[in-house]
Structure formats: structure tokens, C-alpha cells
Amino acid sequence: MEWSDEGIILGVRRHGESAAIVELLTRGHGRHLGMVRGGASARMRPLLQPGNSVLASWRARLDEHLGYYQLEATKMRAATLLGSSHAVYGVTHLASLARLLPERDPHEEIYQRLVLTLDDFDDFGVAAAHLIRFELAILAELGFGLDLSACAATGSTTELIYVSPKSGSAVSRSAGEPWRDRLLRLPAFLRDDEAESGNGWSGQDLFDGFELTGRFLLRNVLEPRGQSHSDARAGFINAITRALQRPAES
């Protein structure tokens, strides 16, 4: 068995004296592990870092075997990502989200969103908006997608500012006003198609976004598996909070 594909490194662990087991999210073969000979060496360390993009060639005698990788760098992001706390936490959290996907099951949209998110980590606000969208995409890919296209009560597609915590559907301003204290806030950048790039956010939008996705991830995905939110998610949100406070302190 043999294939070649684009991939992003999610994690690496040492195996024996000199090898490493590398976990990739690939474009066409999903989340996939393989062994890299000499992967524990100092020469390979810069390449085998989470967030780096590679061209991966995988080979095994049988499809169900772990197999061996040969990896070639296509984009080395790790050195830049390690330069900011929000990026370090963000990459770790993205990897934990990708691990919610079944192994060896292709999820090309998730792969593309991961690339988009990793390439926009320079700006903490844009990175946060992308990460929230990534969490929404994970929910959808696992069968728990939110319906943010129209009001669940009236069918209206305008003034969608709430989300029902029960159904995961959008609610308009007028329909939700009597129950606003029980509803989740829908951030502007999630209801504006033009904000796909991640722009147009406010600090409150970001916190509302993480509250929204966090609620449904915990209830529908994590708790049924006996899991909770990653420490890296909390670290990322704390780093964003500190970054938002800096201008006021200067």
C-alpha cells in the first residue's frame, strides 16, 4: 500500500531510540499516523513541529498497518507560530479538535480550514475568528452543525442576533427579545458572509463566539466521550483577553 498527499503535522511522539510517530491531517486521507525513521534526530526536529505543512509519502505492507512516512517540507510555520502565546495555544487546540475526527476518514473542508487558520495567526483577532469558524466546521462535520441561516421561529433571514441553546438554530431580534437572557449571542462576523476572512470582529464578538461553539462542542461532542475542553482552548482565550487589554494599558 502506498500513497502521497498534502498534510499538516498535528503531533509527534518519540518511538524507540531514533524513530518518531507523526500524526498528520491530510487533504485526501484524513487524520493519519505513520512512523518516520530518524524522526527523533536533531536534524528532523525543525520539520516535525505542529503546524508545519508537508508532502507526505506513506507506505505499508497492509492498509491497516501503521506504515512509514517520508516527509518533505512545503511550508514551515512552526518558528513563527512559536513566537506568540496565542498561536502556541491555538495550534495545540486545533490539533485537539482535529483528533475528534475518525482516523483515516477524509475531511477535505476541515483540512482547507486548518490551512486558512494557520496562515492567519499573525493577527490575534483574525486568528480567533477563524478558530471559532473551525469549531463550527468540526461540529458540522461530526453531525452537529448549527443552523445560522434563518430564524427558527419566524423563518426570517434578517437581524439574526441570537442562537437557541437547545436547537442550535438562529433566532431573530424580534422573536428572541422576550427570551434574550436564555439565548446565546450570535456574533456579527458569523452572520455576515463578507466576514469570512475573519475581519469585522469586536472583542465581545470573539467571546460570544467561543461561548457559542464551546456550549455545543461540550454538550454534543466532548461530554459524550468523557472529555472536556482542552487546556489549550482556555489558554488561547486568555491570551486573546490579554491582547485585547494591551491598548488600554498603553
Curated annotation (Swiss-Prot):
Residues annotated as transmembrane: none
InterPro entries on file: ARFGAP/RecO, DNA_rep/recomb_RecO_N, NA-bd_OB-fold, RecO, RecO_C
Example of a GO cellular component annotation carried by this entry: bacterial nucleoid
Gene3D superfamilies per the UniProt record, alphabetical: Nucleic acid-binding proteins (2.40.50.140), Recombination protein O, C-terminal domain (1.20.1440.120)
BP GO terms, sorted: DNA recombination; double-strand break repair
Reported function: Involved in DNA repair and RecF pathway recombination.
Annotated protein name in UniProt: DNA repair protein RecO
Species this chain originates from: Rhodopseudomonas palustris (strain TIE-1)
